A protein has these predicted regions:
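Short, surface-exposed, charged amphipathic helix/loop patches that serve as local interaction elements
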Residues: 6-13, 19-137
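Short, basic/low-complexity N-terminal boundary segments at the transition from targeting/disordered tails
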Residues: 1-5
């Protein structure tokens, strides 16, 4: 199995409507932008929606995940859909949102979530700055 650090720098090839697209794992700024969009798109209720267990809210979270990732990492998809600059993907109709969400869940989410899990594990394995009685910065 490849080292996850190497996987983070590799280009993933995905296909949307017959067009192959290259995507790299988000850098720190992009990761934060994705998470900020999730918060904005959910009106600050992303965690509540995710934890609710309500089918419609779980679907809404899936839509939010898809749109947030596409907005930040796959601007080519926006261009293919002729979404005007400055307009959010959240303004697309429900049929297109469903298509984008299904595509994201099939081609992006397994890869992205797997690498995020590996980052969490690696981060949790590292000692805190204060574990050894070090001074606060």
């Amino acid at each position: 199995m490849k080292d996850y650090v190497q996987q983070l720098s590799e280009v993933k090839v995905v296909e949307f409507r017959g067009t192959k697209l290259n995507v790299k794992f988000p850098n720190v700024g992009e990761m934060i932008d994705i998470e900020n969009l999730k918060t904005a798109y959910s009106g600050g209720r992303y965690g509540v929606m995710l934890a609710s267990g309500v089918k419609s809210m779980i679907y809404a979270v899936d839509v939010i995940d898809a749109m947030s990732f596409i907005e930040i990492k796959l601007k080519a998809v926006r261009n293919m859909l002729n979404v005007p600059e400055g307009q959010s993907l959240m303004s697309v109709d429900s049929a297109l949102a469903s298509e984008l969400t299904a595509w994201y869940k099939q081609q992006i989410a397994p890869w992205y979530n797997s690498l995020m899990s590996k980052l969490y594990e690696a981060g949790n394995a590292q000692p805190s700055l204060n574990d050894d009685g070090g001074k606060d910065a």
